Amino acid sequence: MKDISVIVKYFVLFKSIQLIIVYFTPVQFDTSSQLIIEKYRNDKLQVLSDWKLPFQISDSILSNIIDKFITWDAVYFSDLFLNDIKYEHQFVFCPLWWRIIKWIPIGEGNYYKKLMLGMLCSNICHLGTCIILYYLTFEMFKTSSLFTKTLREFSLISSIIYIISPAGIFLTASYSESPCALFSMASIYLREISINRENFNHLNSKNSLKTHWIYKVTYLLSGTMVSIAYGIRGNCLLLGAMFLFDLYEFGIRNRDITDSILSLVSGGQIFVSIIALNWYTYAIFCPARGEWCQSWIPSLFSYAQSHYWNVGFFNYWSLANIPNFLFALPTIVLTLQSFKHFTEEKPVKNLLPVMIVNGMLLVGAVFWWHVQILTRISSFLPLMYWFVASMWISDSPTYKRYSENTMKFMIGWNLIQTSMFAAFLPPA
């Protein structure tokens, strides 16, 4: 519990610094948010009257902090927290996240109360992810002799580094990154505690999963967590690769029929989520909508990504997007170094499924998606944070210095990014 209290203290300190920066960021480059602020002026006045604080203090908090979180995608989220869907593309806009906030019976009918509820839930999820990462690190590396003596410190440092994640202010705003990461880390943790590492990867093993029934349940729950994470952010579909990996290990290498079926059921939950989300939009729009309804695989998600956001192979590779590639470059470099570190320098076989997912994410971001979002969406995977933490606990002065410089960069990036976000400047 002592380590958890340390994590909480660092978390509160860092969030406080972020909010101070937001408060003192002078003006917004894009003033379109003022239209929303003016539209919900009465909602703001209602909040001011409900708070038991002097008016000037309450108004200062709302005007200088909360108003500055009405930027970029938070504009869409905050609208959906309160209002019904108006446009087609909103159906694929992190559908489960905004529905969760909308369904919570707090602040109903008030724009500002729902916005602040979204921010509160986002920060709770961020803290929860830090704590899960602490226990996940213990579980993932406890069988590795390379980390036995420093496992507690390694786990704590990994969680602290996650607090200063390059995702930064997006884990504080009412974005979907924090809840997505929470359920993603939970899924990896539940999967990891379910696997019998004493026998795993041995060809003649009779046990792929631990024998007690509770571990069969936790393994199935790991698939449930991925399904929820996918409903929050589509990129979590990549986590399904873990269960395909397990199917290979359980069925082909270990020849365990029972646990092979469990891997199919656990991973199959993600498939059910995909079918359900696509069927829902198809039932609403098709066949009258035409266009994407007539595709071989009718998917509003795929259509919206390509039609509204120009997502596609090499679509983002242009001179105008060079700055966006530069924004993502540190995350790309750290991810590639993580692969090298955990395959060559400190090989940990348990990490292979996570590295596969991370590799797929990297390829997708660089070649298909808006590459700058890699900085924030990569927060649903722990590999990069483990790499920096591993450097930190190393006996090598060079490695330790590298880790220190990386953390300094993360802190500096967070401070700059927070100010840019509050000023409605890229990257988004």
Swiss-Prot record:
GO MF assignments: alpha-1,6-mannosyltransferase activity; glycolipid mannosyltransferase activity
Top-level enzyme category: transferase
Statement: the UniProt record of this protein carries the keyword Transmembrane helix: yes
InterPro entries per the UniProt record, alphabetical: PIG-V/Gpi18
Keyword annotations from UniProtKB, A to Z: Endoplasmic reticulum, Glycosyltransferase, GPI-anchor biosynthesis, Membrane, Transferase, Transmembrane, Transmembrane helix
One GO term of the biological process aspect: GPI anchor biosynthetic process
Transmembrane segments: 4-24, 115-135, 154-174, 225-245, 265-285, 316-336, 351-371, 373-393, 407-427
Subcellular location(s) per record: Endoplasmic reticulum membrane
Pathway the protein contributes to: Glycolipid biosynthesis; glycosylphosphatidylinositol-anchor biosynthesis
EC annotation from Swiss-Prot or TrEMBL: 2.4.1.-
Any one GO CC term of the record: endoplasmic reticulum membrane
Role according to the record: Mannosyltransferase involved in glycosylphosphatidylinositol-anchor biosynthesis. Transfers the second mannose to the glycosylphosphatidylinositol during GPI precursor assembly.
Family, similarity comment: Belongs to the PIGV family.
Protein name, per record: GPI mannosyltransferase 2
